[in-house]
Amino acid sequence: MVRAKRKLDHIEYALSTGQSRTHGFHDIDFVHQSLPNSSYETITCETKIGELSLSSPIFINAMTGGGGEKTLHINEQLAYVAKHHNLAMAVGSQMAALKDESEAASYKIIRKVNPNGIFFANLGSEATVEQAELAVDMIEANALQIHLNVIQELTMPEGDRDFTGVLQRIEKIVLNSKVPVIVKEVGFGMSKETMQQLASVGVTAIDIGGQGGTNFAAVENERRQRMLSYFNNWGIQTATSIIEATSTNNNLSFIASGGIQTALDVAKAIALGANTTAFAGYFLRILMEDGIEKLVDEIDLLHTDLKFIMTALGAKTIEELQSVPLVVKGETYHWLTQRGIDTTHYSRR
């Protein structure tokens, strides 16, 4: 019951605290192309995360589940939207259903709505190999997300306080998983060092989950009597984290998430090196406040606008979009300079 109540609290406070939009994409400028030699009608948006092929560089990221009828209904609607647009979709942490079997329906509903969809299971880094297998089987998942949420847990009144052995548990899951494993942050970004550690234990896909979207420190602080306000601005911005990711030179696929709301955000994230992008809080707000048809329409517009931007840049495919010239400036540039990461290759390609 406590876990289910927390799931509902997260939805309420995620909506009320909103998205900070401090993602850093304002520091990224495309170099205009007056002769793009492209046609809107020939633009294609297919992409891949590792060996997993996706029809769009936009997918519905982990939001909820395990909170009774309300979360079941949300996942049901999101699965419908995913089916309509042929998008991949992740569910929220399934630990609730592993602890209480009655909550499994709030996750299984997605497969009923969209039998042939691409779905990602989701568990925290405390999960065992056996729990990971159960989560994947529960929704017949195509991949498994393992989320890292140290700051959220520390801010959460009833959260974890011990984070030893996480990398070793992830390694065991990677070695034993029958589906690809994606390790993700939840809005605090990832450093290049973290990603190098993950790559060293066999992780091949990372969702950088940067600062700039739903702020789970702020969400958990709403649930506390004494706020840990020093965590409210903690983290690495999304744009910065993507560049840190690409600087590792590992054979990794990257998902960009964290405050992404527009087609321009998507285009910039991919041009910086992401393979795909993920939306959560922005889609949830539209669904809850404006309804499912409005969300369907918004995703249509995102795809249209992304193709307009790609046409302007002369990028006919997502792979070509990853090679267009851009300039990194402002606070993002200064951060990366201090971190010893050269950004001039973006502007000179």
From Swiss-Prot:
Pfam families, per database record: FMN_dh
Binding of FMN, residues: A62, M63, T64, S93, N122, K184, T214, G258, G259, A280, G281
Cited SUPFAM superfamilies: FMN-linked oxidoreductases
Binding site for Mg(2+): E153
Gene Ontology molecular-function annotations: FMN binding; isopentenyl-diphosphate delta-isomerase activity; magnesium ion binding; NADPH binding; oxidoreductase activity
CDD domains assigned to the protein according to its UniProt record, in alphabetical order: IDI-2_FMN
Domain of life (superkingdom): Bacteria
Gene3D superfamilies: Aldolase class I
Family: Belongs to the IPP isomerase type 2 family.
Oligomer status and interactors: Homooctamer. Dimer of tetramers.
PANTHER family hit by this protein: ISOPENTENYL-DIPHOSPHATE DELTA-ISOMERASE
Protein name (Swiss-Prot/TrEMBL): Isopentenyl-diphosphate delta-isomerase
